[in-house]
Amino acid sequence: MGTAAAAAAAAAAAAAGEGARSPSPAAVSLGLGVAVVSSLVNGSTFVLQKKGIVRAKRRGTSYLTDIVWWAGTIAMAVGQIGNFLAYTAVPTVLVTPLGALGVPFGSILASYLLKEKLNILGKLGCLLSCAGSVVLIIHSPKSESVTTQAELEEKLTNPVFVGYLCIVLLMLLLLIFWIAPAHGPTNIMVYISICSLLGSFTVPSTKGIGLAAQDILHNNPSSQRALCLCLVLLAVLGCSIIVQFRYINKALECFDSSVFGAIYYVVFTTLVLLASAILFREWSNVGLVDFLGMACGFTTVSVGIVLIQVFKEFNFNLGEMNKSNMKTD
């Protein structure tokens, strides 16, 4: 009786494990470490590129000739490579929100390189963003719901995901060819929407390339199909990155780098998590407590980002607040 019960329990555990694979603690730690470093590197890219654009405008030359702009571009490439490695190690919903750490880092860097203001509320926002990121790490799912190339192909052909991609493509065409030429230079949300919607392609493509590469490297029977899938995803990823790169630089030419970085994080993260939820179904392994924890963490990060940006023009510090309190007394 006991043996039969144990066998049944083992079978149930095996069946549950088929749909979700939990990476080893070492893999999770490594993936988180790479994601954190990548977010900091990515946080510096907008600032360095903006600095290069400003320097080039002063000289009356193209920013393509400025070494600081190229430093920011190289940093962006390094950050994206780091994200690719992180996505192959841990779930997307664990990596993407950590981009929040790049926002306060970029704001601090911008206060030195671009002389942008960072008052006491901005510093509080930096603290909240970091605290919210920790909450996200604690409550994010640690198991993978898609672990093979065959599962990935099945998810990619899911009617819900195909419908979502069609809507995204339609919105991108509308934004790029109609709205952006007329309103892009005056409305920051136009360029941010284009770059963020493209995240619906870049992040799932990156994750998919990692899964397909496993079959290719292990020379599985399905390696030929995996190679074709990998090439298609590489093409999608390459096109998405090129378009993103173009509109990020357009935005930096017209708007404050910190404001762009902050709003971009919130919109990009929201859309990427939506695309990942539809494609990879990683949220299916999240309980109510963890879901609420992630919602609170993301809200904390968003509030921190708002504090960094919305109140950046307010000229006050703790000394002035103490003086006003003394006068009141």
UniProtKB/Swiss-Prot annotation:
Self-association state and partner proteins as the record states: Homodimer.
Protein name: Magnesium transporter NIPA1
Disorder cited: Spastic paraplegia 6, autosomal dominant: A form of spastic paraplegia, a neurodegenerative disorder characterized by a slow, gradual, progressive weakness and spasticity of the lower limbs. Rate of progression and the severity of symptoms are quite variable. Initial symptoms may include difficulty with balance, weakness and stiffness in the legs, muscle spasms, and dragging the toes when walking. In some forms of the disorder, bladder symptoms (such as incontinence) may appear, or the weakness and stiffness may spread to other parts of the body.
Function summary: Acts as a Mg(2+) transporter. Can also transport other divalent cations such as Fe(2+), Sr(2+), Ba(2+), Zn(2+) and Co(2+) but to a much less extent than Mg(2+).
Extracellular-side positions: 1-27, 88, 139-159, 205-224, 281-290
Main location: membrane
GO annotation terms (biological process): magnesium ion transport; transmembrane transport
Entry keyword set: Cell membrane, Disease variant, Endosome, Hereditary spastic paraplegia, Ion transport, Magnesium, Membrane, Neurodegeneration, Transmembrane, Transmembrane helix, Transport
InterPro entries: Mg_trans_NIPA
PANTHER family to which the protein is assigned, alphabetical: MAGNESIUM TRANSPORTER NIPA1 (PTHR12570:SF17), PTHR12570
Cytoplasmic side: 49-66, 110-117, 181-183, 246-259, 312-329
Gene Ontology molecular function: any one: magnesium ion transmembrane transporter activity
Any one annotated GO CC term: early endosome
Segments passing through the bilayer: 28-48, 67-87, 89-109, 118-138, 160-180, 184-204, 225-245, 260-280, 291-311
Tissue: Widely expressed with highest levels in neuronal tissues.
Locations listed in the record: Cell membrane; Early endosome
Catalytic activity: Mg(2+)(in) = Mg(2+)(out)
Record-stated family: Belongs to the NIPA family.
Recorded topology in the membrane: Multi-pass membrane protein
